[in-house]
A protein has these predicted regions:
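Terminal alpha-helical segments
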Residues: 1-132
Length: 132
């Protein structure tokens, strides 16, 4: 579904890009991605850092396109329109969003180092799109 169609059904809101907001989202995400690779931290801390970094970058991409969403998962779904990432990498974000929700809201905790590594890799790929 296009960004315009998502706006039409009230999943997105048109909002002019704010360069300061976008810059700060990218900066915070960059720091979180870096911290997520510190092996001295627990798995859950590293996952939270990588997930929140990726969400911040996806939100920055959406904001740069002139939209905002009130729903976390939508920013990941919009990456097919707001980034050059391959669909496989975008699916990693969706999988991690589902895992995050299971852990946060249902107490289902599953440690998966491979998924975390893929999340960090996908987050770094998204971060690279913002670097000139």
């Amino acid at each position: 579904m296009s960004l315009e169609n998502l706006e039409r059904i009230n999943k997105l809101h048109v909002e002019a890009p704010d360069q300061e907001e976008i810059k700060n989202l990218i900066l915070a995400a960059s720091e979180r991605l870096s911290d997520s690779q510190k092996t001295g931290l627990s798995y859950s801390s590293r996952f939270d850092l990588a997930y929140n970094a990726s969400h911040g970058l996806a939100l920055a991409a959406l904001r740069a396109a002139g939209y905002r969403s009130d729903q976390r998962y939508i920013v990941f779904q919009c990456l097919q329109h707001t980034s050059g990432l391959a669909k496989g990498r975008i699916r990693i974000f969706s999988t991690c969003h589902e895992r995050r929700n299971l852990a946060e809201y249902e107490g289902h905790y599953e440690k998966d180092e491979q998924l975390l590594a893929e999340l960090i890799d996908a987050g770094n790929a998204l971060l690279t799109e913002f670097q000139v």
